[in-house]
């Protein structure tokens, strides 16, 4: 087989090695525009798990690479004048130039033809070979040439970052967070040789502009950034530059990775944010998978390339999603700068769903025990009864006004909620209880006056009252969601505007704002008379009050429509009136949709403003939901998918939150509450 590989980065060189190793008769050529010793950046990092694949794929290069590693186990977090160390994070670093040299030597040893200083302006001269491999990086000529076939999706993360070096070896992988007059500067630092480290510095675009970095030369930028981190570098040490330009991280994802005899891999096909340290790992694993597929299918090139895609794309997509979560986390890190150092380090380590409380405990049990003890002391106001070991965070108590919840677990909405009071959750939230007969979802929806007396013992019950609005007069949901009753069985519907919820549902009348408040106040009074101590107002999921909040459902031209201030007027009037009716010592919650998950819906900024206004009007806890404002919702699913919204609301608005969304284990609850992303979590059953 004749193979032309465009690009002599790690992916291209490693693929050439593996192809030539699998069959010495293969004619493998690597074409590179730069000199063999030219490289940008400083070091690359590998996790412990990624080395197993390299060992199996080519033991000779594995030995050469690992003998050049700088390895470490702990990880340091430097924040607010403290250093927190977390063990069990086994990583290794190597100079990028050294990695490329070792791969070049191995390729040359096997007989790979290496052509440096050759500019590839067109792929045309190389297409006569059996296989053309685009390993030409994020700015791939190969991908651009076949854009119609690869169908790339390109984007850029809003934060700015630059790669620097340092003339010292940090003892371990080190995160540094510095508050400056211009904003927060972050450095992700790792050693790659005896006297050298990589420092990736990350800042917001606002900080980049406020500091004047947007107008500085490369040398001026280097000197400025060194001054920011001089205390961490220490006297006599300095930062180093090598094309250390401020950039936005490029997002690259392609629907297809091959066409005909052309295939792309590594950064040419996909990128993953540097904060999860997987870019080089993904590139090398691409090479392993492609070489393996070619060896298995031999002359059947299409089968080999198809198998390569089928094997690698799901793996890459999962890591890309994790890297997006991680990138967004670092871009919004300032919201956590009120956290104590232990909790700050904990939430840093658990920033993606891949690392949970149990995972972290397996890495560093002592660190997790310290976090558990600290969390319990914060929740209970004192050490947990003098115990040597604190219970897990999910079982810490929570006080809302004068009501104490036994733990952070919730069940909701529970149709037969009375049967779940002793299931172990500290809180049980009822399904929507209608404030009037016209506010029911379906004929089986309970009215406040029909509730039983508040039970004694077991979990606390939060009664969720609301008005279904244009999602009312439906069949019971066991027959299907949002299916209208037969015409004779329907009751009149109201909404913020006369817009049907879905094309097949009835058109409601525009609600009279003057008649919004009293049904909620009366329902709250009835709930209290029955002895319940927790009440929630349901302003979510397209129900009546939610329709006032969302620009997708509210097209009014009076003082209750248009601006966010106007759209809030009705919900805030209800909240204020119910808060005045509900006893001052008892907590009042609000459920609201933090995102409509549909184009043109509530913006992220407006969503946070809504949460702040609810808090100011007397809401003690917010159940942060998403979607269902309109039937065209584009749902987001995945492990703990709703936690990010809860996190944002809790830590930017200063209000306790209830998180939802495929939270299925106590381990996940431990993780979310200990990290400060929620105060209570609804367990999916």
Model-derived features: positions:
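Conserved mid-domain beta->alpha element of the FAD-binding
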Residues: 8-18, 134, 245-325
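Conserved Rossmann-like nucleotide-cofactor binding loop
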Residues: 11, 36, 139
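Glycine-rich FAD pyrophosphate-binding loop
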Residues: 20-41
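Conserved N-terminal glycine-rich FAD pyrophosphate-binding loop of Rossmann-like flavoproteins
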Residues: 35-53
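Conserved N-terminal helical subregion
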Residues: 48-163, 368-378
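Conserved FAD-binding catalytic core of PHBH/FMO-like flavoproteins
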Residues: 105, 126-249, 253
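C-terminal helical "tail/cap" subdomain of flavin- and related membrane-associated enzymes
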Residues: 292-383
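Flavin-dependent oxidoreductase catalytic cores
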Residues: 370-685
């Amino acid at each position: 087989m004749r193979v032309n590989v465009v690009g002599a980065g790690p992916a291209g060189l490693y693929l050439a090695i593996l192809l030539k190793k699998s069959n010495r008769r293969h004619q493998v050529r690597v074409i590179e525009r730069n000199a063999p010793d030219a490289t940008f950046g400083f070091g690359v990092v590998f996790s412990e798990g990624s080395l197993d694949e390299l060992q199996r794929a080519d033991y000779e290069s594995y030995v050469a690479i690992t003998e050049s590693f700088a390895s470490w186990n702990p990880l340091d977090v430097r924040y607010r004048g403290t250093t927190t160390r977390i063990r069990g994070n086994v990583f290794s670093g190597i100079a990028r130039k050294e990695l490329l040299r070792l791969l070049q030597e191995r390729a040359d040893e096997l007989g790979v033809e290496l052509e440096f200083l050759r500019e590839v302006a067109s792929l045309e001269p190389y297409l006569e070979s059996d296989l053309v491999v685009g390993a030409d990086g994020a700015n791939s000529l190969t991908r651009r040439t076949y854009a119609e076939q690869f169908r790339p999706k390109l984007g850029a993360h809003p934060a700015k970052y630059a790669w620097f070096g340092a003339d010292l070896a940090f003892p371990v992988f080190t995160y540094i967070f510095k508050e400056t007059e211009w904003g927060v500067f972050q450095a992700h630092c790792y050693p790659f040789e005896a006297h050298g480290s990589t420092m990736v510095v990350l800042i917001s675009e606002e900080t980049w502009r406020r500091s004047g970095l947007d107008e500085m030369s490369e040398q001026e930028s280097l000197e400025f950034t060194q001054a920011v981190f001089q205390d961490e570098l220490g006297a006599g040490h300095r930062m180093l530059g090598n094309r250390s330009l401020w950039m936005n991280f490029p997002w690259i994802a392609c629907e297809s990775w091959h066409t005909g005899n052309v295939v792309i891999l590594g950064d040419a096909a996909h990128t993953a944010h540097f904060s999860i340290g997987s870019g080089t790992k993904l590139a090398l694993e691409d090479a392993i998978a492609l070489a393996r597929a070619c060896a298995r299918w031999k002359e059947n090139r299409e089968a080999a390339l198809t198998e390569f895609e089928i094997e690698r794309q799901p793996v890459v997509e999962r890591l890309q999603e994790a890297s997006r979560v991680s990138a967004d986390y670092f871009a919004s890190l300032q919201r956590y700068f009120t956290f104590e150092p232990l909790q700050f380090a904990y939430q840093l380590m658990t920033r993606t769903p891949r690392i949970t409380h149990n995972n972290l405990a397996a890495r560093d049990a002592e660190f997790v025990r310290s976090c558990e003890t600290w969390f319990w002391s914060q929740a209970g106001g004192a050490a947990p009864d003098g115990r040597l070991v604190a219970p897990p965070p999910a079982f810490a108590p929570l006080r809302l006004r004068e009501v104490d919840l036994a733990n952070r677990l919730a069940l909701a909405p529970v149709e037969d909620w009375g049967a779940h009071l002793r299931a172990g959750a500290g809180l049980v939230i009822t399904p929507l209880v209608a404030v009037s007969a016209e506010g029911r979802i379906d004929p089986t929806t309970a009215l406040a006056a029909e509730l039983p007396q508040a039970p004694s013992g077991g979990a606390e019950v939060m009664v969720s009252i609301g008005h279904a609005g244009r999602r009312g007069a439906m069949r019971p949901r066991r027959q299907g969601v949002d299916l209208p009753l037969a015409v004779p069985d329907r009751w009149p519907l109201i909404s913020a505007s006369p817009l049907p919820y879905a094309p097949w549902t009835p058109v409601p009348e525009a609600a009279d704002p003057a008649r919004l408040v009293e049904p909620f106040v009366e329902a709250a009074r009835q709930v209290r008379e029955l002895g319940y101590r927790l009440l929630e107002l349901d302003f979510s999921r397209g129900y009546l009050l939610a329709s006032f909040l969302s620009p997708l459902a509210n097209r009014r031209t009076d003082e209750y429509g248009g601006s966010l201030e106007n759209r809030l007027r009705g919900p805030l009037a209800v909240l204020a009136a119910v808060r005045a009716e509900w006893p001052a010592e008892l907590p009042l919650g609000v459920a609201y949709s933090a995102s409509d998950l549909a184009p043109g819906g509530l913006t992220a900024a407006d969503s946070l403003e809504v949460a702040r206004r609810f808090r100011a009007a007397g809401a003690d806890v917010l159940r942060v939901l998403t979607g269902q404002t309109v039937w065209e919702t584009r749902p987001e699913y995945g492990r703990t998918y709703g936690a990010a919204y809860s996190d944002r609301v809790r830590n930017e608005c200063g209000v306790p939150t209830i998180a939802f969304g495929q939270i299925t284990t106590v381990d996940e609850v431990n993780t979310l509450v200990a990290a400060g992303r929620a105060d209570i979590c609804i367990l999916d059953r």
